[in-house]
Swiss-Prot record:
Name of the protein in question: UPF0248 protein LS215_2790
Stored HAMAP family: UPF0248 (MF_01245)
InterPro entries named among the record's database cross-references: MJ1316 (IPR040459), UPF0248 (IPR007547)
Family: Belongs to the UPF0248 family.
Amino acid sequence: MKIKDAVNMIRWEYREKIDDYVIIIIDRLTENGLKEISFSELDAVDNNYLYLKSEENTVIPLHRVLMIKRKSDNALIWKR
């Protein structure tokens, strides 16, 4: 399954529990090199980028996405 398909599946099929899902990305500015982004922060996804709801209009390239997890049981939904 492609990243875009996994993101869209969660956004539309599990929208009632969207806060339970996070996207883990590579972020060189953090101490451990990883950053969690809640699905509630996500505005859109296309074939190349994640677009976040923010005043800065943050755009994250999909090649930085490492995995998608469910927080409640720490289940791995998608992994590179």
